[in-house]
């Protein structure tokens, strides 16, 4: 007579190691790591804006041309300080460039602490003010440069750029540089808005 084999389930002893779960979860990577990349790009754009703003102010501020012919009583000369609009342009672009230089430490703080909202909020407010000043100066100077190139027959304003070519070329370059600075400011404001998002 054969004995039937029986299986007996034995409980595992306490010495057998079971799978253990860690009591403290591993720290997850903090969300919003893209904010540091935005802050670095913001810093680079500010350096570019400093260059364009200084170029605009320097180009306009050094625009001076004297025609080689003159009479006994008249000397034909054109300079930026002959027009208050161009004087305003030089002063405004110098202020914008100075502000951009002073904003660099705040941009560095935003790189070191990308989740800090205070410096970013301050920059977005001051950038808006600087953008307004920059746009006003560029638009005013652009109107005068347009008249210098084309004149206005209704008011008998003659185009002077045929005679003062170098003067008009420098002024036109300054206006273009100022509007490049405007575009950079718009990008800075968009970046700051993205950086202030909570999610």
Curated annotation (Swiss-Prot):
Major subcellular location class: membrane
Signal peptide: none
Cytoplasmic-side segments: 1-37, 109-120, 195-199
Keyword RNA-binding part of the UniProt annotation: no
Name of the protein this chain belongs to: Casparian strip membrane protein 2
Keywords recorded for this protein, A-Z: Cell membrane, Cell wall biogenesis/degradation, Glycoprotein, Membrane, Transmembrane, Transmembrane helix
Subunit structure: Homodimer and heterodimers.
Protein role: Regulates membrane-cell wall junctions and localized cell wall deposition. Required for establishment of the Casparian strip membrane domain (CSD) and the subsequent formation of Casparian strips, a cell wall modification of the root endodermis that determines an apoplastic barrier between the intraorganismal apoplasm and the extraorganismal apoplasm and prevents lateral diffusion.
Protein's membrane topology: Multi-pass membrane protein
InterPro entries to which the protein is assigned, alphabetical: CASP/CASPL (IPR006459), CASP_dom (IPR006702), CASPL (IPR044173)
Taxonomy, superkingdom: Eukaryota
Residues carrying a glycan: 152
Family named by the database record: Belongs to the Casparian strip membrane proteins (CASP) family.
One GO cellular component term noted in the UniProt record for this chain: Casparian strip
Residue spans crossing the bilayer: 38-58, 88-108, 121-141, 174-194
NCBIfam families, A to Z: A_tha_TIGR01569
GO annotation, biological process: cell wall modification; cell-cell junction assembly
Protein source organism: Populus trichocarpa
């Amino acid at each position: 007579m054969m004995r039937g084999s029986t299986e007996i389930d034995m409980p595992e002893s306490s010495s057998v190691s079971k799978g253990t779960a860690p009591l403290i979860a591993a720290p997850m990577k903090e969300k919003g790591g893209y904010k540091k990349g935005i802050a670095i790009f913001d810093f680079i754009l500010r350096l570019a804006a400093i260059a364009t703003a200084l170029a605009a102010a320097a180009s306009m501020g050094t625009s001076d041309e004297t025609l080689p012919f003159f009479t006994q009583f008249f000397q034909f000369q054109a300079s930026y300080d002959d027009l208050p609009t161009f004087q305003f342009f030089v002063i405004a672009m110098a202020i914008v460039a100075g502000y951009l230089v002073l904003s660099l430490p705040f941009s560095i703080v935003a790189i070191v602490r990308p989740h800090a909202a205070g410096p970013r909020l301050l920059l977005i407010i001051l950038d808006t003010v600087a953008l307004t000043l920059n746009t006003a100066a560029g638009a005013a100077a652009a109107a005068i440069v347009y008249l210098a190139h084309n004149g206005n027959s209704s008011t008998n304003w003659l185009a002077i750029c045929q005679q003062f070519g170098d003067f008009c070329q420098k002024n036109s370059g300054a206006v273009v540089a100022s509007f490049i600075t405007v575009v950079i400011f718009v990008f800075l404001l968009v970046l700051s808005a993205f950086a202030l998002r909570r999610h």
